[in-house]
């Protein structure tokens, strides 16, 4: 007779459903209630999916993502997840002086910190140029969470 495998817990449950750290769990839940989530949503086993937003008015090659992300949010919700969108350091090669060459590394480092430090179970990476693509892919690989790239 074999024992059934343990059910896989989402990474975010360390924040929102951790009986070994009830005080911090209560604090995290209280903070995220400000987003309009319910305690039931946060503790209900739904995956929390980050949306790494590279689109902005400062980044023309990624500007389309500002509109596309609305559909991504709707898709995550329809699939039973909880979407959380956050910005990434903007990069535009031709608009920044003296150079945008260091921006890829800044975007990478800041994204690693967000992916590691927040209760995200996966991430949608919005990419669109030779700086955001490697920055986002390297960050997701570094943190080792499920990721999909939208270009």
Per-region residue spans from a language model:
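Metallocofactor- and cofactor-centric catalytic cores in central/energy metabolism, strongly enriched
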Residues: 1-151
């Amino acid at each position: 007779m074999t024992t059934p495998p343990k059910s896989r817990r989402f990474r975010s449950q360390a924040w929102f459903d951790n009986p070994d750290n009830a005080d911090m769990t209560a604090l995290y839940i209280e903070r995220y209630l400000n987003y309009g989530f319910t305690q039931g949503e946060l503790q209900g086993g739904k995956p929390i999916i980050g949306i790494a937003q590279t689109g902005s008015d400062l980044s023309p090659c990624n500007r389309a993502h500002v509109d596309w992300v609305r559909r991504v949010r709707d898709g995550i919700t329809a699939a039973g997840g909880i979407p959380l969108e956050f910005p990434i350091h903007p990069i535009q090669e031709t608009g920044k002086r003296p150079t945008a060459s260091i921006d890829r590394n800044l975007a990478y480092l800041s994204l690693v910190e967000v992916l590691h430090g927040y209760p995200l179970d996966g991430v949608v990476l919005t990419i669109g140029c030779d700086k955001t693509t490697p920055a986002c892919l390297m960050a997701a690989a570094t943190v080792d969470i499920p990721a999909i790239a939208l270009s």
